[in-house]
Amino acid sequence: MDWIVHQLRVHPELAIFLTLFVGFWIGKIKIGKFSLGVVTSVLLVGVLVGQLDITVDGPIKSVFFLLFLFAIGYKVGPQFFRGLKKDGLPQMGFAAIMCVFCLIIPWILAKIMGYNVGEAAGLLAGSQTISAVIGVAGDTINELNISPETKEAYNNIIPVSYAVTYIFGTAGSAWVLGSLGPRLLGGLDKVKAACKELEAKMGNNEADQPGFMAAARPVTFRAYKIANEWFGDGKRVSDLESYFQENDKRLFVERVRQAGVIVKEVSPTFVLKKGDEVVLSGRREYVIGEEDWIGPEVLDPQLLDFPAEVLPVMVTRKTVAGEKVSTIRALKFMHGVSIRRIKRAGIDIPVLAQTVVDAGDMVELVGTKHEVDAAAKQLGYADRPTNQTDMIFVGLGILIGGLIGALSIHMGGVPISLSTSGGALIGGLFFGWLRSKHPTFGRIPEPALWILDNVGLNMFIAVVGIAAGPSFVQGFKEVGLSLFIVGALATSIPLIAGVLMAKYIFKFHPALVLGCTAGARTTTAALGAIQEAVESETPALGYTVTYAVGNTLLIIWGVVIVLLM
């Protein structure tokens, strides 16, 4: 054991990976619905490892923190700038005011309790579950004209305050918005009804809307032998597909075997006759059962041997950006193609007829390869799987953003700047938006973005925990249980105020009120709790724009809280 401890002291990089290993493992453990979460677990494990008196030198903490902030900005950039448009301004304005609440309430409570700068920053970071504040506030503290000992004391107490307040910040947010929120809107049953009403308004009832599906409802391809007298002496392919449409079934004829010959490219005017074998594509629940009408299903491996494709496409074409799903679906190039999923700022949004598709959205198409490829060209840029990240783009974005963040102005003799960390966030916002406009460069595959986001943050948190380890226990004794109660207030008050503001001032639809509030507080856990409570995905429609604004402002508040104290 002594040998292992010695090696961890000599090679502190191993201590970091020990912290990540144990932290991620504990963070995945759930007791009922409760989980510490990865970030808190990594921090606490880092504190334990730090008891071994391990010193981590060098810029490793800052490097990974900058990668994390750039990834955050890159992910939400398109939605942040989209919010500046007229239709996004109400949600953007709501998010900005909500974020002010999230700053002012912790600041007032910190002043009342007599907290120092580090305790206030930790309170903000934990109660609002915005881990990046730890780094941004720390950078700002390091620029203050105070003694090195005081700087160290402030920086060491931040993770203590964060750890104490983060647990309620996460679990409490989910409870406030998932349980208390619907009551503030008139009761859970009323909110459920409002969500169903919005679904019906946007998609004529999603469950019955042909051609739309959740990811669990895949497109399928089945072959049938025509036996129905409806075909008479022959019906064109367009006649059959129109018949399906009239019966609320968005099905397509993909292939035909006629007189023993397979027709791979079926035109709308192709005539189908009794005895022909046809391949139909569409939602599984509509395709299965057609033997009751067309004729018996046939197992024909040769007829069914053709490439089908699931392809994510980034929407960039001005002709479709801003259009409703129903409008896009009706376009000629969407023949044979279904929309399986829409992701916006990394969040799944409901695929409903009236859902508006924005530039930068990732739309997942399903169908035969040639039809999907044709549709992809008309929608935007096919985001085909790749293992390559454009590191030129990443490096340049962080460099330019960091240089901008390093610029400072002096107010009352105090240098004020975004810091390199805030600059990296701004760089990510701009470069993420730029990539949505010009998707041929700047690609960061989703797994790589996950690494930058999660590993970047947790590597930073691990080093913070290890550094704070020796003073953590004493710091915890100083802040005590009272900080937990203060943190609960700092979490709950802005959320309750946000729900009431969204309802009475901004007059958002009840289905969007909770989603907008969760987004402004960037609490994905609460969004899941809301959707589970109201039994609908519609709250996600209010989440994305407010999430982009919240993720930006709440991180910048790490600078502001230090200056206010």
From Swiss-Prot:
Molecular functions (GO terms): monoatomic cation transmembrane transporter activity
PROSITE patterns (alphabetical): RCK_C
Keyword Signal tagged: no
Superkingdom of the source species: Bacteria
Topology term for the membrane: Multi-pass membrane protein
Subcellular location: Cell membrane
InterPro entries xref list: AAE_transporter, Asp_Ala_antiprt, RCK_C, RCK_C_sf, YidE_YbjL
Membrane-crossing residue ranges in chain numbering: 14-34, 36-56, 92-112, 117-137, 157-177, 391-411, 414-434, 448-468, 481-501, 508-530, 545-565
Alphabetical keyword list: Cell membrane, Membrane, Transmembrane, Transmembrane helix, Transport
GO biological process terms, semicolon-separated: potassium ion transport
GO cellular component: plasma membrane
Record-annotated RCK C-terminal domain positions: 296-381
NCBIfam families tied to this protein: Asp_Ala_antiprt, YidE_YbjL_dupl
Family classification: Belongs to the AAE transporter (TC 2.A.81) family.
This protein's name: Uncharacterized transporter BF638R_1531
Record organism: Bacteroides fragilis (strain 638R)
Lineage: Bacteria, Pseudomonadati, Bacteroidota, Bacteroidia, Bacteroidales
